[in-house]
Regions:
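Hydrophobic lipid-interacting interfaces of membrane-associated proteins
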Residues: 46, 60, 95-106, 124-126, ...
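Terminal amphipathic/targeting segments at protein termini used for secretion
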Residues: 77, 84-94, 126-142
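Extracellular/luminal segments of secreted precursors and ectodomains of membrane proteins
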Residues: 89-99, 105, 113-115, 127-129, ...
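An exposed acidic His-Trp-rich patch
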Residues: 110-134
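Tubular lipid-binding modules of the TULIP superfamily
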Residues: 1-118, 205-206
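Glycine-rich loops and low-complexity Gly/Arg-rich segments
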Residues: 67-68, 76, 81, 117, ...
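Extended amphipathic ligand-handling, pore-lining, and cofactor/metal-binding catalytic surfaces
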Residues: 132-202
Length: 206
């Protein structure tokens, strides 16, 4: 009927969580700024005019989980019955997250000088899928928390002299390490903040 729950009710529900409740819970779990692991890798030499490139990044920080935080991406599904439970789903954009590191690279040219670098990595059009479920009038719980395939924009302050093959290898290793760092936080500590948050806001009726 006219009073049936719609995607707009779901949107309001999710917006209320991501705008206030989730940032507060994430902050209480110390997720304003998260230390992420250091890493190192080698990009192999491809010709006599370049050497193996030795790269290391440390002092990694992940920010953006609390402020500006995650935002709803598109419309949520309308609340609907699945068995005896009401369930709704939504995509949340991860593009406000930001990874930063300092580091160094040696071997981008035959001179083999050591270059100090700073690295900034931002997810682009990347999202998480959240599903919340609740028994009739009961406390909501997190049914699904899924991170979809991540794409990154990678920025390095000091340009390295790399041919296309080596540049691709350099960027793909950074993307791989960035994905591991993000998933490690999003699927454990941040998931706990999400679980706490959905429990505290009443779901819309179907």
């Amino acid at each position: 009927g006219v009073l049936a729950g719609s995607k707009y009710d779901s949107n309001v529900y999710i917006d209320s969580i991501v705008s206030t409740v989730l940032p507060a819970n994430a902050r209480s779990l110390g997720l304003d700024s998260v230390d992420v692991p250091s890493y190192a890798f080698i990009v192999k030499s491809t010709s006599l005019t370049n050497r193996d490139l030795h790269v290391e990044f440390h002092g990694g920080k992940l920010v953006g989980l609390v402020s500006p935080g995650l935002v709803r991406w598109g419309d949520c599904s309308a609340p609907g019955w699945q068995g005896f439970n009401v369930t709704l789903g939504c995509y949340l954009l991860l593009d406000n997250l930001h990874l930063s590191y300092v580091g160094s690279a040696k071997g981008d040219s035959v001179l083999n000088t050591n270059k100090t670098l700073s690295l900034n990595v931002v997810p682009v059009k990347s999202s998480a899928f959240i599903e919340v479920t609740s028994g009739s009038g009961g406390i909501p719980s997190l049914k699904t928390w899924l991170i979809r395939p991540l794409n990154f924009s990678v920025g390095v302050t000091k340009p390295l002299t790399l041919n296309d093959q080596r540049k691709t290898a350099f960027q793909s290793e950074i993307a791989k390490q960035s994905q591991a760092a993000l998933l490690n936080v999003l699927l454990v500590r941040f998931k706990e903040a999400v679980e706490r948050s959905v429990r505290s806001v009443k779901m819309p009726k179907p």
